[in-house]
Amino acid sequence: MSNRLPRALLADIAAVIGSGDHASALMRLGDESGPEASAAVSSYRAQCAAALGDFDAAERHLRVALDLVERRMTALPADEAARARLAAALTILPPADAPVTPTLEVISPELTAVRLRRMLAAVFMKAGRELDAEMELALLPVEARSL
């Protein structure tokens, strides 16, 4: 379970968001009661909010998601092999709006943080906040700065 939703349901939500079916994802996510405990769930809520044009809610959910993965990153020891995999992954990133899975959140909070920040920059671009988007992208490694 992640944020009180079974992982199989979260995989289904990621798939429907990936197909562009935000309406179905919104229904599967249910209400927003309680604290969010999963960056993936927060990012799914953000993507649904952005699809509805509620960019403030999308930003809020993505900030929660970033906070969750950044806290996880500080709790994990540095791993040279993981850094090498991250460097390789940065060269083949999916589109900025590609859903983040709960598994990726656990396996690589660093890559998850990069993807969430790119997602936030894309939300800012959709909202007409180009300067905010540029500032978010500037926080990323050079390889990850394009949308």
Predicted regions and their residues:
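Structural signature of alpha-solenoid helical repeat junctions
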Residues: 4, 37, 44, 105-112
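Alpha-helical segment of the N-proximal tetratricopeptide repeat
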Residues: 6-31
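"A position-specific structural signal for the A-helix of alpha-solenoid helical repeats
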Residues: 11, 44, 112-115, 119
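Alpha-helical junction/boundary sensor with strong preference for TPR arrays
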Residues: 36-37, 68-72, 76, 143-145
